[in-house]
A protein has these predicted regions:
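Non-heme di-metal
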Residues: 1-120
Length: 120
C-alpha cells in the first residue's frame, strides 16, 4: 500500500494484524467507491451508446464490490454494524433518525421504532 491518504499513518510494526486487515479492507472499499465515480463520469462524458452500456455494467460491478467490502467491514466492526443498522434502509430524514436516537426529539425513526432509543 503506497503512501497516500490510503497509506498507514502509524508504523506497521506498531499495528496489530487485525488493524492491518481492517486497513486493507478499507483501502479496497475506497478504491471501489472511486472506481464507481470514475465510471459514472465516463458514462456522462461518452457520446457512444454502446460504450455507455459497457461502462454502466463496469460501474455496477464496482458497486457490487463496494457493497461486499462494506459488508466485510460491518461484520468485523461492532460499532460500524450498529451505525449501519441505525441508518441504512430507512426513510425520512437521516438527521431526525440520529436526533431521535440521541434523545434530541425529531421525527420517528424510519424503522417503526417511534424514534425511541435503546433503554440499556
Amino acid at each position: 500500500m503506497a503512501d497516500s491518504s490510503m497509506g498507514l499513518h502509524e508504523a506497521r510494526e506498531d499495528l496489530s494484524p487485525g488493524t492491518l486487515e481492517r486497513h486493507r479492507g478499507l483501502v479496497s472499499l475506497m478504491e471501489e467507491l472511486e472506481a464507481m465515480d470514475w465510471y459514472q463520469q465516463r458514462i456522462d462524458a461518452t457520446a457512444d451508446a454502446e460504450l455507455r452500456e459497457v461502462l454502466a455494467h463496469n460501474r455496477d460491478e464496482e458497486t457490487e464490490h463496494a457493497a461486499m467490502s462494506l459488508e466485510w467491514m460491518r461484520r468485523k466492526d461492532a460499532v460500524l454494524d450498529q451505525h449501519l443498522r441505525q441508518y441504512l434502509f430507512t426513510s425520512g430524514s437521516i438527521v431526525a433518525i440520529e436526533e431521535a436516537e440521541e434523545g434530541g426529539g425529531g421525527e420517528a425513526a424510519g424503522d417503526g421504532s417511534l424514534g425511541i432509543g435503546s433503554l440499556k
